[in-house]
């Protein structure tokens, strides 16, 4: 049998030939994409003048750009897959960011394939926003490994072409999206949602009443000893409904990945600090930030309840994610997320966190999802000497993305001087409202990322906060900073308006406040 190195050497010429062919196809198809985008723009211009009667040409123009993006995504995936075969190593994670791109492209293809003329507007907006985020993440992983991974340039070229097409699709969609969506007034908001008895069973009922599909116990008293085994077993036996996996009290030293195709997974533990999942991957340890996550969930409808996610790589290990979520319509309830730098990666799509504790140091809540935190405890730990703490680092890279971080009715505290956030990407968007802000939050509130980057294009808002750190008199004076939002402005970042939670959250059984809290 040939050695792995000889196999790799044999495949490299084929890979290079494949690159030449793919790049040639990209040059041809990009020209056609420009033509389609140009024609589609004219369709959308007509639609903008006659919004009440969109023509079939308008829809066809938009769908054509989506199809073009999908064609390029398929080519990019073929390239990524070929590169994973040609660059096998013993320590794959240390050198190969292409696996990140491959996983993200699968997610993008899943979303693009679901777009058709009759989709709900907010679903389409979410999918296009997430597809762009996936490209940003692929490029970030390639950049993190640029010195050790020599095929990164080819993948980066393909990724950037796809990014351009997805940007065109998103721009066209935003240009025609209904501008007349009615925001509920404060008086019209219904009170805190209380789930029905049947819905409450999902997130409130004792485990014994849940009719779980698998039981995981380290001592062998369940159906499986590891979470990974339970996920694999239930995925093979799934009938398409919700899969409920009970994790008995104990410490699980595993890295868990719930892929895009594994939807509606619910992990149920015995409580914070009782059911604990621990990992130690870190950027300094050779992993891309994306792959450092102790638990990663990409499958739509993910729910986690009553457990703790930990990355114990330590404060000197740089990026080390405890929980990464890129699952649409996901809920994290009564959990704890513990780490240092980059503890919680709210990667993409619509997410909701309730009664959850999040601890960390640098940028410990980051990503580009549309996410609302309610009734959570957010605590910054003591940083390393000379290090500064930032609660958030929101990653919105395009003004058309419907993403951002909304922190409502939470407690934000810190062991040392900490900033509410800084702009990871140019159009970073974060709002803190109706929350308690401790005295260790810096009077300026927000910090630059680097120089003047994003300070005019970001959106940082505050509304109705309390506590010794809530005074806005010393807040930064950037044009993108809004320390005193109006009621109307704040309502845009509530559960009902920002993540359409009043539509999909009831089925999860979690209690939530759809609007501003009285």
Curated annotation (Swiss-Prot):
- The EC number on file is 3.1.1.11
Q: Which CDD domains match?
A: PMEI-like_4
State which tissues express it.
Expressed in siliques and floral stems.
**Where does the chain bind substrate?**
289, 319, 422, 424
SMART domains (UniProt xref): PMEI
Q: Note the SUPFAM superfamilies from the entry.
A: Pectin lyase-like, Plant invertase/pectin methylesterase inhibitor
User: Where do the segments described as Pectinesterase inhibitor 16 lie?
Assistant: 30-172
Catalytic machinery residues: 342, 363
PROSITE patterns, per this entry? PECTINESTERASE_2
Sites annotated Transition state stabilizer: 341
Family annotation (InterPro entries):
Invertase/methylesterase_inhib, Pectin_lyas_fold, Pectin_lyase_fold/virulence, Pectinesterase_Asp_AS, Pectinesterase_cat, Pectinesterase_inhib_dom
Recorded GO terms, molecular function? enzyme inhibitor activity; pectinesterase activity
What top-tier enzyme class does this entry carry? Answer: hydrolase
Q: Which GO terms describe its biological process?
A: cell wall modification; pectin catabolic process
Catalytic reactions on record: [(1->4)-alpha-D-galacturonosyl methyl ester](n) + n H2O = [(1->4)-alpha-D-galacturonosyl](n) + n methanol + n H(+)
UniProt-listed Pfam families: Pectinesterase, PMEI
Taxonomically, the superkingdom here is: Eukaryota
Pathway stated in the Swiss-Prot or TrEMBL entry: Glycan metabolism; pectin degradation; 2-dehydro-3-deoxy-D-gluconate from pectin: step 1/5
Keyword annotations from UniProtKB, A to Z = Aspartyl esterase, Cell wall, Cell wall biogenesis/degradation, Glycoprotein, Hydrolase, Secreted, Signal
Anything else known: The PMEI region may act as an autoinhibitory domain and prevent untimely PME activity during transport.
Please give the family membership noted in the entry.
In the N-terminal section; belongs to the PMEI family. In the C-terminal section; belongs to the pectinesterase family.
Annotated PANTHER family:
PECTINESTERASE (PTHR31707)
What is the protein's given name? Probable pectinesterase/pectinesterase inhibitor 16
